[in-house]
């Protein structure tokens, strides 16, 4: 529990000293849910409108309100499969119905066509989604309870796979 306290103290520092809006918690499913429940409750006493995003998809992350949103990884992989014609587009409809039943109404889902992991390891949305990239981008904005993620350079149509561990600057855009 000493590690838990130290982590919660560090998070509270960022809230009180730097007024951050919230936290993106990497691989949240690998941390005990009890930590997230206790820490979220503690942090929301300091900042009631705190936003907690889990880089995970497990339903139990929402049971006691630890998180506000989580990544929609299954939807992301379905979009890739639809774009590559490995599955029918109706799979996305079926996903939406199932997702609605799987998560509480308050749970937001981070909808994305790319992020730092996908872009670096599996290619840009141009290479993964091809001609379907624009319609899939629109889809991330209209999916129920969706919270669209615009990843680096997507707002300008930048087609590039970034190096994960090396400096890889974005060219100046005018």
Where are the regions a protein language model picked out?
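Short, solvent-exposed helix-loop connector elements
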Residues: 121-128
């Amino acid at each position: 529990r000493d590690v838990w306290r130290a982590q919660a103290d560090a998070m509270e520092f960022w809230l009180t000293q730097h007024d951050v809006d919230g936290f993106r918690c990497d691989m949240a499913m690998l941390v005990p849910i009890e930590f997230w429940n206790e820490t979220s409750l503690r942090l929301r006493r300091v900042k009631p409108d705190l936003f907690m995003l889990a880089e995970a998809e497990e339903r139990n992350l929402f049971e006691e309100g630890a998180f506000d949103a989580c990544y929609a990884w299954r939807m992301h992989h379905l979009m890739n499969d639809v774009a590559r014609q490995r599955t029918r587009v109706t799979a996305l409809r079926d996903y939406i119905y199932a997702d609605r039943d799987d998560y509480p109404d308050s749970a937001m889902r981070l909808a994305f066509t790319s992020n730092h992991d996908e872009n670096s390891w599996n290619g840009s949305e141009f290479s993964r989604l091809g001609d379907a990239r624009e319609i899939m981008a629109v889809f991330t904005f209209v999916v129920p309870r969706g919270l669209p993620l615009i990843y680096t350079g997507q707002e300008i149509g930048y087609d590039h796979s970034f190096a994960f561990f090396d400096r890889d600057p974005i060219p100046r855009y005018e």
